[in-house]
Amino acid sequence: MEKVKQTIRAPRGTELQTKGWVQEAALRMLMNNLDPEVAEKPEELVVYGGIGRAARNWESYQAIVDSLKTLESDETLLVQSGKPVAIFKSHEDAPRVLLANSNLVPKWANWDHFRELEKKGLMMYGQMTAGSWIYIGTQGILQGTYETFGEAARQHFGGSLKGTLTLTAGLGGMGGAQPLAVTMNGGVVIAIDVDKRSIDRRIEKRYCDMYTESLEEALAVANEYKEKKEPISIGLLGNAAEILPELVKRNITPDLVTDQTSAHDPLNGYIPVGYTLEEAAKLREEDPERYVQLSKESMTKHVEAMLAMQEKGAITFDYGNNIRQVAFDEGLKNAFDFPGFVPAFIRPLFCEGKGPFRWVALSGDPEDIYKTDEVILREFADNEHLCNWIRMARQQVEFQGLPSRICWLGYGERAKFGRIINEMVANGELSAPIVIGRDHLDCGSVASPNRETEAMKDGSDSVADWPILNALINSVNGASWVSVHHGGGVGMGYSLHAGMVIVADGTEAAAKRIERVLTSDPGMGVVRHVDAGYDLAVETAKEKGVNIPMMK
């Protein structure tokens, strides 16, 4: 991949570079994904998650930009794995962009085949929100992480993480949310990363409190704050596959253990034991097969240590990076003895159509986001948990790139919020249109048996019709851009997922599209969980009037 040193930053204000606000939104969000404040390696078009890219290569990026600038409001741009391949006449209510990223026929859906295609310039890895142009930095996963640790606290520690120690690893674009999510829940956390730049970045953005290279110092500070029942987050430089076994050897057992290293990609994401970043980069280039094998061996040690901590009483869970699968394939037959975070903590939210709803101020003015915060506090005042989140986010979350906010809203709530936002744009309360989107990690848009659809009640973990149906209904209902991806979060062969974005530009046409899309999108989550036999989903569907032909 050619590295290009250029600073990309989305335009601000109300002057259009394109022929309409929906095209402008797509252009600005693509550029925002590559803002140095947002992207992990913008010079390589990498947004987050190992090699999750916004465009296939720099030539494709420029062609996408040029296409969006000339795209008419009754045309649709098609993007195939980060490359613009066609512009067709459609209609004004159709999506302006349709994206398909990293999709492979199942028999060939593995990293080896993907890398062959990538080398030939035929494919890119889109992760989830990298290739679909709706990544907003670490805040994008923060509330989900906060909810996960909050539910762990409710289930196991009386509702708070005060006086507890969480041990985790991985402080990249996704995992970087963990330190702040734990301290927001009152706990102490040691978060390990092998890359000092990742820790520095989290400290700079106030997601992590302190840095150390010493395990002894990390433990001393953690114990001091744990005894005081005060929160603190400690970024520890090191390799988790070395540090966790060392803690097991010393008989040190944290209260909570998880992991968000980029284990989904053994070649580009995980650093084997005994290698510096520079040595790892050299080996990756010279002998990728050996690198992958060493990575897998290190991951197996990592999981063995997590299992040992679980046996000693630590609440242990997989945080969706497929590390258990790698260890299992390497011969660790009890690798799945600890659960994934979705069945352990998040699925009840999915049954209610809840998920990581996000919005972005295209104006670039933080005041637009603060005004929308007030809408949440006013319109959803009876949801104290949600309002607490908004208050904490305002105080503690620093914007990356265009100002944005995330909060988990459910079926009915998303459409209500979208309507209000569109009205605020229409009457001038907000200075420019708002982009509304979500992660692909949502209630009805993913098939991922080791993550979002792990341990489904009816055994339908691997059924991949649901994300396809999600993308189809969102497209016909008028989402501004829709994406279908493969391999996000857990790597090639293990997931299919869909994303949608809709623009609130203040028009009556947008209001109708928002009503349709922000009803059908979370509605798919309710439907998917009704179909799997979840009582809470059935209750939600009946209460909200979701039309499900065979529901009992």
UniProtKB/Swiss-Prot annotation:
Biological processes annotated in GO: L-histidine catabolic process to glutamate and formamide; L-histidine catabolic process to glutamate and formate
Pfam families reported for this sequence: Urocanase, Urocanase_C, Urocanase_N
Disulfide partners: none
InterPro entries: Urocanase, Urocanase-like, Urocanase_C, Urocanase_central_sf, Urocanase_CS, Urocanase_N, Urocanase_Rossmann-like, Urocanase_sf
Cofactor note: Binds 1 NAD(+) per subunit.
Cofactor: NAD(+)
Binding residues annotated for NAD(+), in chain numbering: 49-50, 127, 173-175, 193, 239-240, 260-264, 270-271, 319, 489
Catalytic activity: 4-imidazolone-5-propanoate = trans-urocanate + H2O
Encoding gene, per UniProt annotation: hutU
Alphabetical keyword list: Cytoplasm, Histidine metabolism, Lyase, NAD
GO cellular component entries: cytoplasm
GO MF entry, a single one: urocanate hydratase activity
Pathway: Amino-acid degradation; L-histidine degradation into L-glutamate; N-formimidoyl-L-glutamate from L-histidine: step 2/3
Organism of this sequence: Bacillus anthracis
Residues annotated as the enzyme's active site: 407
Family: Belongs to the urocanase family.
Function: Catalyzes the conversion of urocanate to 4-imidazolone-5-propionate.
Main enzyme class: lyase
Entry's EC annotation: 4.2.1.49
Protein name: Urocanate hydratase
